[in-house]
Design a protein with these regions (language model features):
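Aromatic- and carboxylate-lined catalytic core of secreted/periplasmic carbohydrate-active enzymes
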Residues: 193-271
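Active-site mouth of glycoside hydrolases
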Residues: 1-144, 148-149, 153-156, 164-165, ...
Length: 271
């Protein structure tokens, strides 16, 4: 259903299997309600730092068969599906303090994926990951070199550094308005270098990624107050959006911004 929905809007998703970012201890079943005004309050790590650490410490291999089955069955099922743009096997391995411990699982995941070898490209980001061995592994294994850059002053130097690798480049995370990586700033640079870019946020929904990262500091306080987003509740919004483009009613955060996006994508000369 998800892929059909994406196809109906001419969107090709990048499918992410594992992730070291945000909150640990993921569990199956009903999930906690989002916390109002907090960036991405429900996002969970996959499979979670506890399991990643156990795999690193070789305390148990009970998780490996399950994770291998998850990885390979998914890739096998959709390996020829043209609705999928790419597989991002592991988002930002090493993030949120776990560091090089993620290397062990990451290496397993790359090997599992190459046993299936889907038709779509495989990747895991360089800039955005933590740890020299992790970054080196991703650079060696990725069909397309992907990177994450939110700070305006780092975007062009990052591209200059990574283009020497000699493989196609795609920026799969960018656009934090308060850090200067607006569409008006980033898209001309991507166009200059012929770099692909993928905007992960579209509509400001219950994940509330239009609020900035600093709001995470108030997560426990707001949760204790019971300040939750329930089904059918209207959503508040900050004066300056961090990420995302549209409201749920389809109106843009900035009409000037969406006009600029349309203009640069139409290949008309920028003013």
């Amino acid at each position: 259903n998800f892929l059909d929905c994406c196809q109906s809007f001419e969107i090709k998703p990048i499918i992410v299997l594992f992730d070291d970012c945000h909150y640990p201890f993921p569990q199956l079943g009903p999930q906690p309600l989002p916390i109002r005004g907090i960036h991405n309050s429900g996002w969970k790590q996959s499979p979670g730092h506890q399991i990643v650490t156990e795999i690193f410490e070789l305390k148990t291999e009970k998780h490996l068969k399950r994770l291998q089955t998850y990885t390979q069955e998914l890739l096998e099922l959709y390996k020829e599906d043209e609705r999928i743009l790419m597989w991002d096997l592991y988002n930002e391995p090493g993030q949120f303090g776990i560091g090089e411990k993620s290397y062990t699982l990451l290496d397993y995941v790359w090997n599992w994926a190459h046993e299936i070898r889907p038709s779509q490209p495989l990747t895991s980001c360089l800039d955005g990951s933590i740890g020299d061995s992790i970054i080196a592994l991703n650079q060696n294994k990725s069909d397309i070199i992907t990177f994450h850059t939110y700070e305006a002053e780092k975007l062009e130097p990052t591209i200059e550094k990574l283009r020497t690798i000699g493989r196609p480049l795609m920026c799969t995370e960018y656009m934090a308005r308060e850090y200067g990586t607006t569409f008006e700033f980033c898209l001309p640079i991507f166009k200059k270098y012929n770099i692909a870019c993928y905007n992960w946020g579209l509509v400001a929904g219950r994940s509330q990624t239009n609020f900035n990262w600093e709001t995470i500091l108030y997560l426990n306080e707001e949760r204790d107050k019971g300040n939750l987003v329930r089904e059918g509740d209207s959503l508040t919004e900050p004066n300056q959006w961090f990420h995302d483009i549209f409201r749920q009613d389809g109106s843009p955060y900035s009409t000037d911004e969406t006009a600029f996006i349309k203009k640069i994508l139409s290949n008309k000369e920028l003013q």
